[in-house]
Each structure stands twice: as structure tokens, then as C-alpha cells.
């Protein structure tokens, strides 16, 4: 394979590129992993983001093999976009997964352009868009959370730990990377006597202070203020089983894409529970308890009320009740 430098879309001249797109994607991801490339908050990328980009490398490589072509910077045009999306659609990937891979490619292309490796601006076209679709991100009600908390899991240490770590997420409304690593260094007492968790969010660097409710304090006491080490993949596996044991089996309608068509089917709620459900549940239940939105945002780290309201799960009926209670 021989690489020919792409032509500038504005001048028509060749732009000098020291490495191919494939090589740059590999370097970009490696630098994310070793910490030499930071995110927009000037912080190291989280493990889940790095995992997504590694997945993108595999998918991009498979796409190149399927098309029998090594795509380079100058090849990323609207025809490429249409082919890329069609290829994923034919493989029954969800709209949001396809959108995530398009977004990752756009981020990589922008970074390479800033580094002077190409002058291809077609990714900024409105037609080169990141596809998104609303997904059925559920939340657990306070009664469902209590059902999980009340289960006797003393005969299974791993499940017991997974349950407790998940509940910490429900009580703090933090991301797994933050709520699963809480230790004595994050716990302090305010002058008022209120016990709080004081932490810096790993993804954004936001400083948040969360009041410790009695249920949370019981878990912290159980582990002497240092949660046992847990792995997201394991907690994701166990929490579905735990939710089923707690009787959280309501049927939920979910949509998916098959052969480019949107279809729906029913899934038991327990099978939709995952580590991030804890954060969404915590934020939603705080809102339903009447805590002011701005106060909850101080805890979750959301920057705008619009962003926050899109994040929490409020039904049309709950919205109507909120309006009735606040004339």
C-alpha cells in the first residue's frame, strides 16, 4: 500500500502527511491509554472511553477489509460516510453505536487536522452527521432500590459486594468510576455535623459534595469507609441477577434496528439494569423527591438544566403531577 498525500479542499495543493490515517488512529488511541493525550477537560481518558476507541480500531479495520481498501485522510468524504453507515446498518448495529463510531472518527480527523496531517474539512458537513436515537434507559424507583437492598446475599460474597457498590451509585448519583472507588479520603464531616462524600469526578474533574444518607452510611460502615475493589463488567453481570431476585421483572418495551428497520420487543426490566442505572436512578429519585434541579446538578455535575432534564427518566404522568404540585 502506498500513501499519496491528500489534496487540500480549499487550495487543491497536496498537504504533507507524515503518517497514514490507520497509523494515526493507532497512535491516537495509544496516547489516550498512556496519558500523553488528554481529554477536553485536560484529564486522562477513562477506561470505558479507551475501550470504545479500541473497539473503533477493530471496526474500522474490518470495514477497510470489507471494502478492500485502506482509507486515508483524503478518502473520508460523504461517499465514505454513506458506505460506513450502510456497512454498520447491514450488521444490525444500533443507531447509537453507529453514531458513536462516526463521532470517534470525526474526533480523530479533527485532531489530525489540528496537527497538520491533512486539510480535509468534509467531516464538518451537515450531512456527515452523528446519528442518535432515544434509548430505553431505565431507572429504579426508591421501592425497587429498597428491594435490592433488603435481599439477603450473605451466602454469595461477590454478589453482596456488587449489590452494595451499585447501591452506593444509587445514593450518590455518580458514575461507576467515581462511586466504586469511594474511600475514607472522600469522607468528611461539615461544621453542621453532616457527613458528606467529597470527590473530584474522574471524567470531568468537577468537584462535588454529596450528603450521606443513612442507607449509604450503613454501607460505608460495613466496609470501614473503603469499598472493596470491583470491576464494572462483573457488577453489570451480577446486578441483573440481583434485580431479578428482587422481583424487578416488569416488562419494558425496547426498540432496536434490524436490517435498517426499527423494531420493538418486550424485555424484563431486570435485564436492562446496569452500573450506569445507579447514577440515573439517583438523579431521577432526587428530582422526584422535590430536591431543586440546581442542587441535584451540583451533585451530578450536569452543566445545563436542559442536559439534566434529558438525562433523568420522568414519564409524562410524573411531569403532569409535578405541574399540579407547582402551580
Locate the predicted segments by residue.
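Short, basic (Lys/Arg/His-rich) helix/loop patches that form interaction surfaces
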Residues: 155-156, 225-229, 240-298
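Catalytic-site neighborhood detector that most strongly recognizes the C-terminal catalytic loop/helix
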Residues: 139, 201-205, 300-325
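Conserved tyrosine-mediated DNA breakage-rejoining catalytic core shared by Y-recombinases
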Residues: 172, 181-219
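Short, polar N-cap/turn motifs at the start of nucleic acid-interacting alpha helices
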Residues: 186-192, 272, 288-311
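Short, charged phosphate-coordinating catalytic segments
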Residues: 110-121, 169-193
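Long, amphipathic, Lys/Arg-enriched alpha-helical "connector/arm" segment
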Residues: 132-161, 171
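N-terminal core-binding DNA-recognition domain of tyrosine recombinases/integrases
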Residues: 33-48, 57-136, 151-154
